[in-house]
């Protein structure tokens, strides 16, 4: 594997010669069910073949050294395996360091450190979960190298905890779950309330999943993500006065409509409407896919984007332009923003023979309107994080 050959060379330069183990952790794309995970709803993500690679060698002391080939300007980051705390100096390394700390807090302290080289081929800031990819990768590395025997769902929870508590990003469980539990050629229907899940075979009948990157820089931590979460929680509190529910995901559309007036704030009401309707849309979409009705699945993806645009307001001109252009193209069954929003990517279901024209037409019109070009990736649906 050419990637690993290059990584071996850099590993020797940075850390010296050592016997290394190789690991890989995918990125993810969510097909439908956006901003529902922390609202106790369903999501339908899959792991993709782009992701994060690592080479790992054990050390004899209690220190770890990390180096990212993607961010060489940051140099080697050194940190203690015990009692690590977040610091701006660590930069990107706060994600893997957070996992070390969460595992230590959960009673899985490491007896020694590691030298770890990272390389990712996920486009930066594309909203394809590069942070979750690194977190789950680190959890899998520690579990494997230290022989801890922790099951993947627990590793996923520890990775999410690292992002919530250590990094300070209030994300739901979807990203880490998709990265850890991904399965080739399948998407995962996950109930974020209970973590009950099942795999659904992605047979798209002569169509492919095309990811289109706006190429607009974004950082979720500094965007309005946490604000949306607070608005949804405020709406839930209002609804709990009249309905015995723990999350918005428990409501049907009709139940929400009957009780929506108790949410006095109009913005909070729209946020909650998205969460409830999107959850139902997701269940309907999976049902359609399992009945081989790819057309209906695509139409529900379009509805999802409209709801994210109008009720949840997390799209923005770049994502809206991509989705609206996709809807106009021949051979496109559905298209929507995926991920947290504000920038990042759309996901489209496109007939295989229409992909070249789709890419050409969307690229030309998007560049003319936005001023820079988008990028396209045809997604290969892959297995979750693992040792290679």
Residue ranges and their predicted role:
Residues 1-23, 29-33, 42, 79-81, ...:
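Gly/Ser-rich oxyanion-binding loop with an adjacent helix/lid
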Residues 342:
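Glycine-rich phosphate-binding loop
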Residues 132-133, 345-349:
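FabD-like malonyl-/acyl-CoA
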Residues 1-28, 53-89, 186-334, 349-388:
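C-terminal nucleotide
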Residues 33-35, 47-48:
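N-terminal cofactor/phosphate-binding cores enriched in small/glycine residues
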């Amino acid at each position: 594997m050419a990637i690993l050959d290059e990584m071996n060379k850099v590993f020797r330069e940075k850390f010296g010669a050592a016997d290394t183990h190789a690991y890989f952790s995918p990125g993810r794309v969510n097909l439908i069910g956006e901003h529902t995970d922390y609202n106790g709803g369903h999501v339908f993500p899959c792991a993709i073949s782009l992701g994060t690679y690592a080479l790992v060698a054990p050390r004899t002391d209690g220190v770890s050294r990390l180096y990212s080939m993607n961010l060489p300007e940051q140099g080697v980051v050194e940190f203690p395996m015990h009692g690590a705390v977040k610091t701006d100096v660590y930069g990107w390394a706060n994600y893997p360091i957070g996992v070390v700390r969460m595992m230590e807090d959960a009673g899985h302290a490491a007896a020694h450190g590691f030298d770890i080289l990272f390389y990712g081929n996920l486009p930066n800031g594309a909203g394809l979960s590069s942070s979750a990819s690194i977190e789950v990768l680190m959890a899998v590395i520690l579990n494997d190298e230290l022989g801890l025997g922790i099951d993947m769902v627990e590793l996923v929870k520890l990775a999410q905890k690292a992002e919530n508590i250590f990094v300070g990003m209030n994300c739901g469980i979807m990203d880490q779950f998709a990265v850890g539990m991904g399965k080739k050629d399948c998407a995962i229907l996950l109930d974020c309330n209970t973590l009950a899940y099942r795999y659904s075979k992605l047979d798209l009948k002569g169509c492919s999943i095309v990811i289109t990157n706006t190429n607009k820089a974004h950082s979720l931590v500094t965007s309005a993500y946490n604000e949306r979460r607070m608005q949804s929680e405020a709406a839930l509190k209002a609804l709990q006065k009249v309905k015995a529910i723990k999350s918005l995901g428990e409501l049907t559309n009709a139940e929400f409509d009957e009780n929506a007036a108790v949410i006095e704030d109009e913005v909070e009401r729209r946020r909650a409407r998205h969460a409830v309707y999107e959850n139902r849309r997701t269940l309907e979409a999976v049902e359609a896919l399992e009945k081989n009705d790819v057309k209906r699945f695509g139409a529900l993806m379009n509805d999802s984007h409209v709801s994210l645009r109008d009720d949840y307001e997390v799209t923005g001109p770049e994502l809206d332009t991509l989705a609206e252009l996709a809807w106009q193209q021949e051979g496109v069954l559905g298209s929507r923003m995926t991920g947290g929003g504000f920038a990042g990517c759309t996901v489209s279901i496109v007939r295989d023979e229409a992909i070249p024209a789709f890419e050409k037409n969307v690229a030309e019109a998007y560049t003319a309107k936005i001023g820079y070009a988008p990028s396209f990736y045809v997604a290969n649906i892959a297995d979750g994080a693992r040792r290679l």
